[in-house]
Amino acid sequence: MLDKIVILGAGESGCGTALLAKKQGWEVFVSDHATISKSARNTLDGLGIEWEEETHTLSKMKDAQYIMKSPGIPAKSPILQSLKSLDIPVISEIEFASKYTSATLIGITGSNGKTTTAMMTYKILNDAGYDVALAGNIGNSFAKEVAENKYQFYVLEISSFQLDYIVNFTSHIGVITNITPDHLDRYDGDFSAYLKSKMRINENQNMRDFLLFNGDDPELCRAVQNINTKATLHEFSSLKKNINTTYIENNSIVIETQKIKTMINTMEFPLKGRHNLLNAMAASTVAHLLDVSKETIRESLLNFKGAPHRLEPVLKIQNIHYINDSKATNVNAVYFALESMTAPTVWIVGGVDKGNDYQILYPLVREKVKAIICLGLDNQKIINAFEPITDIMLETQSMKEAVLVAKKIADKNDNVLLSPACASFDLFENYEDRGNQFKQAVREL
């Protein structure tokens, strides 16, 4: 009789796990409380995998050895509460997939910057000729890559929801880009619980491994000081200079380890903002620890185009710059976006609030924002936060309307910045849909 795994959710993570499990000889059952997409149904049918949609049948799960929970399913969902009584281990996709590869894993997590850092790291390693794949929250699922390929290195973008359900998973190089309040709706508003989840990137690391962390983040630094780890700690910081630190000096990224000091010139680096410099420092340090030359690192960074929906320049129309930062779904991401603005800015903000505290933005809004355009079904919290410090504040209910209003307000050489600070699912399918609608509305001006 085959060992059985039940997979909750038939999205990218669920289908990837189903593919890998089937290939490894497991009996697989996929259950999704929502409607399963046609492409996912075709994939599962092609593999001969039993599935169900719009329900969860507990009786079909009782004989499973493992439950793989897709990251989008909250821990408090009724099905997970029901499964507790069965005492079946619940694991994440990255936990399951890591059982079937001996590759070197680079795990990148954080509240902001993890996608850009993962993409930079992948580009540098790929440019250096490494046999590497980019997976996790970006690109294909990790499980699908393990099922279909045998790469020697994986750069994984990892969310806290995936780290919540690991047991033996470990990264040879773990990276934490920063920790700020985000997804607190999934952690009962408890920042310490969210922080604890992110710190699990260090779990199971040994003395041959490395934990890279943002030394400019005081909350993260305190958390790192409190962990008991055998891994080598290495911070990247725009402020500090020590051994086992990556820092900035004379327009260069300086990587100091116990053995060597390496300098990488950042002149002409295309991505702007302190946050992108920190992302580049993290990616450069990963590459350096894997013996990539500083010349290759610099060349890769100079040719890095940036991730979509992250301070993405769209168009300049009548000398007004339109910038798509739809991925900025929390206050910290918006802070870095506003910090990088060098001209008066019309700021489009709003969506589904995730427990935001906007006070950290007040100095930047006073200094850089000439008008705020609210885009969401419920904008009251944003209005209450910024009306006292903003001369112009307007509400809109569609992206097209928001962009048209922004065009009327903006003057020559101003910026129009979409940086929502909120989730997208009140008016849009996801942040990509929101960003794409912004770009389309700008093109139609």
Where do the protein language model's features map onto the residues?
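C-terminal helical cap/extension that packs against the catalytic core
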Residues: 41-42, 359-414
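Residue-level detector of alpha-helix initiation sites
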Residues: 12, 74, 112-116, 277, ...
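Residues in the short beta-alpha loop(s) of Rossmann-like NAD(P)-binding domains
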Residues: 11, 34, 138, 216-217, ...
